[in-house]
């Protein structure tokens, strides 16, 4: 019998190395190599999981209209591209306590009680919370959850067996980092376990046309924990953003095969759960009774939605050898580049001044068209 071996696997690209290195030799990222057990090759391990497929011409493939099951939460449906697609796999990541489970239990409740759609059978697989905790949350939110089935299980084989037996329409896995397969000896949450469990759940979703929702953890840098290949396996990648000190939450689509990328949904956390914000521009603007310096309002495009956002800037004399460059919602390197452009082409030097830039509401600025508003706020 072949023995397992120890190797170092990159959490970003999944590349392997026989020894630890500070920089991944495959994708050149730093501090991403972690120790992992490489499973011994077992012949025909996945033979029972595959189905034979015949060769077909592309023009002979029968096409049918894609039916999207809406969540009855317009902001969430906007980010998803209209709703959940049968056979589609959605990955939702966010900080602990940001509201991922709350949003999903609200969406599932609306879907199972929506009389305008076909009946929806839902299985909520919880690997972190007990059924009692989930029931308490649903009661606190005053949700009707009589048609939602709870499965407290972290074994992949048992989860797949339950899905094949009950034939649900929607399955939620909370979270993918807690699931493990008996075929692998590594611990739950390891690179190997996350990759293989995600691949098998994706396979069963495509095979049975089940809408699969995977909840993922994020690292301290804000990226999804686990191998980068996880984001390539799924159809849609959503990030739950927001400040823990603020009641507002944002769901952003970073990848979507069935909708627009960079689409943004805005919510407000209340005692009764997440509430939609129908006018997000009001969130990203501060109200002044008179004109103030260091503020500029601009329009940015988030997916298919134009938004009004306010850029605030503060410039002060530096008291150290190296002036500070700090941007909230803006990358520091981008801010440094804009200050260099301002100095070179505008004749305004900030080399002896601290510069602080903030986007009201915590929105992340990615569109280059906002650069002019940033410079106007700094100059004013």
Regions found by a protein language model. Give the residues of each.
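Short Cys/His-rich micro-motifs in 6-15 aa windows
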Residues: 28-38
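Short metal-coordination and nucleic-acid-contact micro-motifs, chiefly zinc-binding Cys/His arrays
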Residues: 4-6, 20
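Conserved P-loop NTPase/AAA+ ATPase motor core
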Residues: 263-265, 271-380
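Conserved nucleotide-binding/hydrolysis micro-motifs of P-loop NTPases
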Residues: 32, 96-98, 128-132, 140-143, ...
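Conserved inter-motif catalytic segment of the P-loop NTP-binding fold
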Residues: 87, 95, 106-107, 111-200, ...
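Phosphate-binding/switch region of NTP-binding enzymes
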Residues: 202-289
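Extended interfacial segments that mediate partner engagement and assembly in macromolecular machines
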Residues: 38-115, 120-137, 146-153, 312, ...
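Short cysteine-rich clusters marking metal-coordination/redox-active sites
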Residues: 10-13, 24-27
């Amino acid at each position: 019998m072949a023995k397992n071996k120890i190797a170092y696997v990159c959490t970003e690209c999944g590349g392997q190395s026989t020894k630890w290195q500070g920089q991944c030799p495959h994708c050149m990222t730093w501090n991403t190599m972690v120790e992992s057990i490489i499973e011994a090759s077992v012949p025909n391990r996945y033979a029972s999981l595959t189905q034979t497929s015949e060769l077909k011409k592309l023009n002979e493939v029968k096409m049918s209209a894609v039916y999207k099951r809406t969540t009855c939460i317009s902001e969430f449906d906007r980010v998803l591209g209209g709703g959940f697609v049968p056979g589609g796999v959605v990955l939702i990541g966010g900080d602990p306590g940001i509201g991922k489970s709350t949003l999903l239990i609200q969406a599932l409740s609306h879907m199972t009680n929506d009389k305008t759609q076909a009946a929806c059978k839902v299985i909520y697989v919880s690997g972190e919370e007990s059924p009692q905790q989930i029931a308490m949350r649903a009661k606190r939110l005053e949700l009707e959850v009589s048609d939602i089935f709870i499965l407290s299980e972290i074994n992949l084989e048992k989860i797949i067996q339950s899905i094949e037996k009950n034939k649900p329409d929607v399955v939620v896995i909370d979270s993918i980092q807690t699931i493990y397969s008996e075929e692998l000896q590594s611990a739950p949450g390891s690179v190997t376990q996350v990759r293989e469990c995600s691949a098998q759940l994706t396979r069963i979703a495509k095979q049975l046309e089940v809408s699969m929702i995977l909840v993922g953890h994020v690292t301290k840098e804000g990226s999804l924990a686990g191998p980068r290949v996880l984001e390539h396996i799924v159809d849609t990648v959503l990030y739950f953003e927001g400040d823990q000190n603020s009641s507002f939450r944002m769901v952003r689509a970073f990848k979507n095969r069935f909708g627009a990328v960079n689409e943004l949904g805005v919510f407000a956390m209340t005692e009764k759960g997440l509430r939609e914000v129908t006018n997000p521009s009001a969130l990203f603007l501060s109200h002044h009774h008179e004109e103030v310096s260091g503020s500029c309002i601009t329009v940015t495009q988030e997916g298919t939605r134009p938004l009004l956002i306010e850029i605030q800037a503060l410039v002060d004399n530096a008291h150290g050898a190296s002036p500070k460059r700090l941007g909230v919602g803006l990358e520091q390197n981008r801010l440094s580049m804009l200050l260099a452009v301002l100095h070179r082409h505008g004749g305004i030097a900030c080399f002896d001044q601290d510069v602080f830039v903030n986007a009201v509401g915590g929105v992340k600025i990615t569109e280059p068209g906002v650069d002019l508003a940033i410079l106007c706020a700094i100059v004013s």
